[in-house]
Amino acid sequence: MTNVADLTSVEKIIVLDFGSQFNQLITRRIREFGVFSELLSHRTTAEEIRKIAPKGIIFSGGPNSVYDKDAFSIDPEIYELGIPILGICYGMQLMTHNLGGKVEPAANREYGKAELEILGDATLFQGTPAKQTVWMSHGDLVTEIAPGFEKVGTSNDCPIASIEDANRKFYGVQFHPEVRHSEYGNDLLRHFAFDVCGCTGDWSMENFIDMEVAKIREQVGDKKVLLGLSGGVDSSVVGVLLQKAIGDQLTCIFVDHGLLRKGEAEQVMESLGGKFGLNIIKVDAKERFLSKLAGVSDPEQKRKIIGNEFVYVFDDEATKLAGEEGVSFLAQGTLYTDVIESGTETAQTIKSHHNVGGLPEDMQFELIEPLNTLFKDEVRALGTELGMPDAIVWRQPFPGPGLGIRVLGEITEDKLQIVRDSDAILREEIAAAGLDRDIWQYFTVLPGIRSVGVMGDGRTYDYTVGIRAVTSIDGMTADFARIPWDVLQKISVRIVNEVAHVNRIVYDITSKPPATVEWE
């Protein structure tokens, strides 16, 4: 697993985790400046931090109170390392508490937007207005600053909203600069990274590739690596990166379960197998999957069948390869968000992180996860740096069960063909309209509804196709995309005229929540 300690040749700022829901945003903001950042446990010791040699440390926010018996704290030697520290919300309170100040429950809790007033010539607020909007989320506040600090910011309900000790380069803010609602939050974080910590912004995908290739070669040696290739962005980027690092020591298994989008299997083989030279074993399992799904209409049962069948197929092929070629490593497209969402001791688990496809735990492979320090947008940037085509790098998110959950009810080959053809038209027209980078996800779905229509001089009784298109930042919430009417009309006309057995198109204008993005 790549971690911040491995990145010895780049500047880095570490974030110590105290459980804030915004932790991921802090690391993202710092990386946007070209400075590598990673979230580490608050239990990380001063000695471990000394070995990492960061340019700066950020204490995150968190839900606890510093005066609670079981409150999260840190190794006090961290304050003696001579490394600049920025405390955010709980982080500012913890620094104050540790260094001799006082923290107490607030008479009026602050949640949401507040007006911050800057006092004097504060380092982190250079070049920003004396009054600015910030995002507060706290129930406690600093009532007495620690020795060596001065108050540099205040708000109506938080008299001590920002502090600094310029000599030791310790800073604290009661608000959340990482949240977009703090209008000059990015400026503050940039001042900390560049002016206080002295970073130059040397983090890039180019040097990530160099470091990761070297690390993979050292880890793998002359052994063989197996990768489950789905055709999605993450596994494709992993494949190309591994190919660059170890060449023909990599073998990819691509399971075509018959539930892929139009032309997807061919594109994977032509692009990844052709241009990039990946050694891909394609397993044609269409009949196997469709026979297992025959007569099944319950969505959860469909998901379970597809997931289990994928495991069986992959396991069969992996076992063969392990015996024949002595495969030692299994590569996965795990992202940094997967690692974070697995939960830590400071936060509730959002979702369990499993290996790809729920592969059997008794498979005797050592894991390689070269993307597990990267966010999704960084993975796309990495793919571009590796020379991968936009058609793969900017591919739409696609669920593991594939079109199996975009055909509502029982799955048949005829229904799958309707979804494939209509979805291909939708993607073509969205791209032609220049909307493919603006809409977060878009696809067609077959609800299983048939209705009366008229085509030519005859009556029809054919299927309805639904179009789902949403805008989102992180997928947790989403709004339906405002696609121009003329584009929707063109899509509708083409689908009805070009896709057999379709006579009606509907557009889903439901947000998430209450609906989910997928229909099943």
Curated annotation (Swiss-Prot):
All residue ranges annotated as the Glutamine amidotransferase type-1 domain in the record: 12-202
Coiled-coil blocks: none
Keyword Hydrolase: no
The enzyme's E.C. designation: 6.3.5.2
Active-site residues, Swiss-Prot/TrEMBL: C89, H176, E178
GO MF terms held by the record: ATP binding; GMP synthase activity
Keyword Transferase: no
Organism classification: Bacteria, Bacillati, Bacillota, Bacilli, Lactobacillales
Recorded metabolic or biological pathway in which this protein acts: Purine metabolism; GMP biosynthesis; GMP from XMP (L-Gln route): step 1/1
Organism of origin: Enterococcus faecalis (strain ATCC 700802 / V583)
Top EC class of this enzyme: ligase
GO cellular component, one term: cytosol
Catalytic activity reported: XMP + L-glutamine + ATP + H2O = GMP + L-glutamate + AMP + diphosphate + 2 H(+)
Assembly and oligomerization: Homodimer.
Keywords in alphabetical order: ATP-binding, Glutamine amidotransferase, GMP biosynthesis, Ligase, Nucleotide-binding, Purine biosynthesis
Job of this protein: Catalyzes the synthesis of GMP from XMP.
Binding-site positions, ATP: S230, G231, G232, V233, D234, S235, S236
Domain GMPS ATP-PPase, first and last residues per copy: 203-395
Recorded name of the encoding gene: guaA
InterPro entries for the chain: Class_I_gatase-like (IPR029062), GATASE (IPR017926), GMP_synth_C (IPR001674), GMP_synth_GATase (IPR004739), GMP_synthase (IPR022955), GMPS_ATP_PPase_dom (IPR025777), NAD/GMP_synthase (IPR022310), Rossmann-like_a/b/a_fold (IPR014729)
Name listed for the protein in its UniProt record: GMP synthase [glutamine-hydrolyzing]
